[in-house]
Amino acid sequence: MLTLFSYFGFLFAALTLALVLFIGLNKIQLI
């Protein structure tokens, strides 16, 4: 159970980081 929770936590963190990088690149291109 704890392993499954850790896996989803890691996946959520990876998706969040990817989203932040994607938004950051878009802001750089808009400037």
Curated annotation (Swiss-Prot):
GO terms for biological process: photosynthesis. GO terms for cellular component: chloroplast thylakoid membrane; cytochrome b6f complex. Component of the cytochrome b6-f complex, which mediates electron transfer between photosystem II (PSII) and photosystem I (PSI), cyclic electron flow around PSI, and state transitions. PetL is important for photoautotrophic growth as well as for electron transfer efficiency and stability of the cytochrome b6-f complex. Disulfide bonds: none annotated. It is found in: Plastid, Chloroplast thylakoid membrane. Pfam families: PetL. It is a single-pass membrane protein. GO terms for molecular function: electron transporter, transferring electrons within cytochrome b6/f complex of photosystem II activity. The 4 large subunits of the cytochrome b6-f complex are cytochrome b6, subunit IV (17 kDa polypeptide, PetD), cytochrome f and the Rieske protein, while the 4 small subunits are PetG, PetL, PetM and PetN. The complex functions as a dimer. Keywords: Chloroplast, Electron transport, Membrane, Photosynthesis, Plastid, Thylakoid, Transmembrane, Transmembrane helix, Transport. The chain crosses the membrane at residues 4-24. Belongs to the PetL family. Signal peptide: none annotated. This is Cytochrome b6-f complex subunit 6. The keyword Membrane applies. The keyword ATP-binding does not apply.
